[in-house]
Amino acid sequence: MFLVRRIFKVKKGTARQAADIITQIGKMYEQAGLRTSSRVYISGSTVPGPSDTVYMDWIEESLKSAYRKDNPTPAKEDELFGILEDQYQEETSVEFYEIYSV
């Protein structure tokens, strides 16, 4: 099993608003049956850590290409990512971890 963590660096002071959109994105993938439930969390406001940063993580049984032919696109994917990218996101990256114990 793998933990996948996506990191979003967002515009100053917009972490909570961006986290709302990112939460919707996670639920969209979960409802489409494409992903397990995700957690969304922030750092840098009331806790130490990089400022204006939102994280989303979830667990995958195996790592697969997001561009594979059998990977459907959820209905609101373009809309939600469009809002995120236009209004909040400055950059994003993805980290992968192999789960050792649960």
Positions of PLM-derived features:
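Short, low-order "capping/linker" segments at domain edges
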Residues: 96-102
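Short, solvent-exposed loop/turn elements at beta->coil junctions and helix N-caps
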Residues: 41-46
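General helical secondary-structure elements
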Residues: 1-2, 35
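An amphipathic, aromatic/His-enriched active-site/gating alpha helix that lines ligand/cofactor pockets
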Residues: 24-39, 50, 58-95
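Short, charge-rich, low-complexity interaction segments located
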Residues: 47-53
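Active-site-flanking beta-strand signature of metal-NTP-handling nucleotidyl enzymes
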Residues: 2-8, 55-57
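Short, surface-exposed ligand-recognition loops at beta-strand->loop->(often short) alpha-helix junctions
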Residues: 10-20
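Residues that cap or initiate secondary-structure elements
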Residues: 12-14, 62-64, 100
